[in-house]
Amino acid sequence: MSLDINQIALHQLIKRDEQNLELVLRDSLLEPTATVVEMVAELHRVYSAKNKAYGLFNEESELAQALRLQRQGEEDFLAFSRAATGRLRDELTKYPFADGGIVLFCHYRYLAVEYLLVAVLNNLSSMRVNENLDINPTHYLDINHADIVARIDLTEWETNPESTRYLTFLKGRVGRKVADFFMDFLGASEGLNAKAQNRGLLQAVDDFTAEAQLDKAERQNVRRQVYSYCNERLQAGEEIELESLSKELSCVSEVSFSEFTAEKGYELEESFPADRSTLRQLTKYAGSGGGLTINFDAMLLGERIFWDPATDTLTIKGTPPNLRDQLQRRTSGGK
């Protein structure tokens, strides 16, 4: 992995009681040793693989103002990180659920792009077996479950300040209030809505195949083709590009897919991040509620699975063997 650390600082917030978070600040930057580089590379890998929301700094963002001064050389990175950790502590004390953690600020370069990564990591206790096969206590950073993380694409921020996607952050699993406090600390608001872009793409694909008057099998083949392209981009950590997707679909219609989306007003960006959960709808139907969960391949609709919209009834012909076995045992006396 071609990752180069420019500067990295660690500080700590320790929760002493419900009202107080103790601030522990380092007096020097971390040296980018092999271990430190490995840790940042792992954090970069884990973060890149997760679904993220996109944002931009508000005009009054204190963090953005301080970062701008630091980038201009008016403040060193350590002082910037110490002051920012203090602001984070002040923001956290507003919330009764707030916990402490290791606060990381890392300025690094990956594939010719400069980033600032900000994270709050849990420092967990565990056990290790030493060379004498004795068990000793140890501590480790819980990188795999890190959920309070944001990353600023410094290159994008400085070269394209009107962008709505230079700031990314994790959102959802940690709960709305946690996401709120971190956004308040960053002084940021949501920008590009990746889910909305992906939903628009799915609708455009369906409309595109309908206008081309494709039959059911042909439409499903196009959906699988789009899914394959988008999934490859997702796995590679790259964005969906309308022009390259249009080339993939060049045989569907005389009108290119990119021209179609522009003419019909879908308001899709030239490129946008792939959203895994939304893209699954290209090949599967899934839903849950009221104690019922259903998930099946899209190609089965109209063949083994039939939906009557008038009565909102789903009819399944041929149940999976393991489900059929459970039903038979339960209805024959519960044996």
From Swiss-Prot:
Keyword field contains Electron transport: no
Location(s) in or outside the cell: Cytoplasm, Nucleoid
UniProt-recorded Gene Ontology molecular function terms: double-stranded DNA binding; single-stranded RNA binding
Keywords: Cytoplasm
UniProt main location, coarse: cytoplasm
Top-rank taxon, per record: Bacteria
Protein's UniProt keywords contain Cytoplasm: yes
A single Gene Ontology CC term: cytoplasm
Record Pfam families: NA37
Family the entry assigns: Belongs to the YejK family.
Identification of the protein by name: Nucleoid-associated protein YejK
Organism: Salmonella arizonae (strain ATCC BAA-731 / CDC346-86 / RSK2980)
